[in-house]
């Protein structure tokens, strides 16, 4: 009886190691994005089309820009630098995800023209504000790296939207027989 029980701990340890490795290598997209609130994550999950998701990410990016403007308008608050860095990173994440969804929508030949046009209209506004912040010099020195990343992400999103508009042909026009 004791002889049969000895392999059990070895089998159990092997199983637990395999389960741990499987859990560690599970896809990252199944996890909640750390820069989205629970309500925002829920909206993304509930969106039925890629176009709606892109528009949501653009609106979340706009919200982060608005919060950045507020933070710079009220300089004396506690933990301000931390919040600003978090907002800049969250903005870059939203823009990156919106841009990634545009590329995915084009690859899958989905109807995302409205979302592409929204990205093309809103992203230049975001870029102008970020460049204005970057030009402030010493007052934004501690945010410079994150700000540069956000500017790069916005430039990439603008470029991706322009490329996607060229690649994403409009749907065929249905004509009535005469």
Write out the residue ranges for each language-model feature.
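Bacterial N-terminal signal peptides that target proteins for export
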Residues: 2-18
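Long, charged/polar, soluble alpha-helical segments
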Residues: 29-178
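C-terminal segment of classical bacterial N-terminal signal peptides
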Residues: 18-27
């Amino acid at each position: 009886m004791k002889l049969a029980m000895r392999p059990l701990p070895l089998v159990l340890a092997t199983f637990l190691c395999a389960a741990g490795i499987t859990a560690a290598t599970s896809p990252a997209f199944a996890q909640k994005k750390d820069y989205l609130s629970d309500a925002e994550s829920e909206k993304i999950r509930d969106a039925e089309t890629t176009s709606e998701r892109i528009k949501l990410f653009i609106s979340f990016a706009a919200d982060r820009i608005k919060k950045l403007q507020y933070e710079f308008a009220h300089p004396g608050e506690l933990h301000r630098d931390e919040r600003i860095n978090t907002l800049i990173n969250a903005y870059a994440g939203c823009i990156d995800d919106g841009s990634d969804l545009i590329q995915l929508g084009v690859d899958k030949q989905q109807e995302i023209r409205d979302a592409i046009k929204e990205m093309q209209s809103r992203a230049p506004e975001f870029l102008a504000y970020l460049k204005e912040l970057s030009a402030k010099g010493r007052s934004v020195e501690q945010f410079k790296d994150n700000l540069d990343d956000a500017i790069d992400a916005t430039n990439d999103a603008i470029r991706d939207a322009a490329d996607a508009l060229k690649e994403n042909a409009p749907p065929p026009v249905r004509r009535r027989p005469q």
